[in-house]
Amino acid sequence: MSDLSKRDQIIAAADQLFYRNGFEHTSFAHIAEAVNISRGNFYYHFKTKDEILAAVINLRLADKRAMLEQWEIEDKNPAERIRSFIKILILNRAKIIRFGCPLGTLTTELTKLDHSAQEDANRLFTLFRSWLTQQFQALGYNNRADELAMHLLARSQGVATLANAFTDEKFIRQEVKHLYEWLDQYAEGVA
């Protein structure tokens, strides 16, 4: 028996299916099959696909917040915390190569669909942007903190997109190395 409620199982399955297949190409039937429930039981928990999408976005936000909070506890200084952010590319490289970045692919798809939840999905990037800005401020780059945060977000998204396009793990490793070197310049105050 799973520790997750049926509703939580549905959200977790939808999260994975939206990531792998895309929001538009994932149906109620796909999610119900993944959780092994009837469509009728499914509708008890969610009436619309948009309700599931909102729950998936909230799940991703909660997961990312918990991850950032963990880094705040584990990593002693802002440079180490930023390094943990960069390391996501290495830790998730197999999934990135196969499916792209879960945040980037969802926000891009919702933008293409002109979906009303696009702004909600953008909160995922805003969470990282705000957190990275705080880390660069803690490194002493108050006037440039947001610029540096956006630069790092753009680089990480570019790496994920190109690694997915070229299915190239070596590229990810190479770019992560460059990002670490870039970060070290700012951490040492030589940038």
Labelled PLM ranges:
Residues S5-K6, A13, L148:
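N-terminal positioning helix adjacent to the helix-turn-helix/winged-helix DNA-binding module
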Residues Q9, A13-E51, A55:
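Helix-turn-helix
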Residues A55, E69-F99, A149-L152:
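Hydrophobic alpha-helical connector segments
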Residues N58-R65:
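Short, basic, alpha-helical segments at the C-terminal edge of helix-turn-helix-like DNA-binding modules
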Residues R65, E80-R83, K95, K112-G140, ...:
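Amphipathic alpha-helical packing segments from all-alpha helical-bundle domains
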Residues W71, L89-A94, L103-K112, A138:
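Helix-loop "lid/cap" segments that line or gate small-molecule binding pockets
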Residues N92, K112, Q134, L153-F171, ...:
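Amphipathic C-terminal alpha-helical segment
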Residues G104-T108, N143-L162, H178, W182:
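Hydrophobic alpha-helical segments that form the core
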